[in-house]
Amino acid sequence: MKIKTSDIVMSAVAPKQYPEEGLPEIALAGRSNVGKSSLINTILNRKKLARVSSSPGKTRTLNFYLINKEFHLVDLPGYGYARVSKGEKSSWGKMLETYLSNRPNLYEVVLLIDIRHEPSEQDQQMYQWIRHYGYGTIVVATKSDKIARSQHQKHFKMIRDTLGMSPEDRLIPISSLKKLGIEQLWGALEDIFVENELPITIEKEAPK
């Protein structure tokens, strides 16, 4: 996917704050500190568009990024951060449920899992939630450069088995640091654009 323009256009906590253009949306979900901001910057070829923090739990809103003026990439609040009150966790859960259940122009939710660790109970719940609302599913295994390639298949099996992934679910290893797996992820998203006949221009990035 050739990225010509990308900008953050909205941060929202309620439906009345969502963008109203009705453009197609692709959402990214995952635990705090799983690497969502780094992935956004990498796939959009921007260094600091999404703020990367070493402190988990920084994303507390739904952040909408307008891509090529044709669709939105939506960064969902990270879950699983221990130093958050029960009330705040509950409000985040309601925010996510409201968005996932009442957004007709949302076409896919991509779940990010740290390849190094077994998916947590909250990861499993999020996966089931995504399936419940009828999305793909695409699972991205982040930080794939942090383990030896010889260990990848072992960790892929761990992720698939723990989440209970279907054989048709896509599991894509990604390294934002080394820019590995980016084309594969865009390919999976482009398939969704085509399958749903979305008016999104699919133009490949020229080889470097």
UniProtKB/Swiss-Prot annotation:
Annotated S-S bridges: none
**Molecular function in Gene Ontology:** GTP binding; metal ion binding
One BP term from GO: division septum assembly
Q: Which cofactor does it need?
A: Mg(2+)
At which positions is GTP bound? Answer: 30-37, 57-61, 75-78, 142-145, 174-176
Q: Give the protein family.
A: Belongs to the TRAFAC class TrmE-Era-EngA-EngB-Septin-like GTPase superfamily. EngB GTPase family.
Q: Does the keyword Magnesium apply?
A: yes
State where Mg(2+) binds.
S37, T59
HAMAP family named in the record? GTPase_EngB
For this record, an example GO cellular component is: cytosol
Task performed by this protein: Necessary for normal cell division and for the maintenance of normal septation.
What PANTHER family does the entry give? ENGB-TYPE G DOMAIN-CONTAINING PROTEIN (PTHR11649:SF13), MSS1/TRME-RELATED GTP-BINDING PROTEIN (PTHR11649)
Task: Tell me which UniProt keywords the record has, alphabetically.
Answer: Cell cycle, Cell division, GTP-binding, Magnesium, Metal-binding, Nucleotide-binding, Septation
Q: What InterPro entries does the annotation carry?
A: G_ENGB_dom, GTP-bd, GTP-bd_ribosome_bio_YsxC, P-loop_NTPase, Small_GTP-bd
Q: What is this protein called?
A: Probable GTP-binding protein EngB
Q: Which intervals hold domain EngB-type G?
A: 22-195
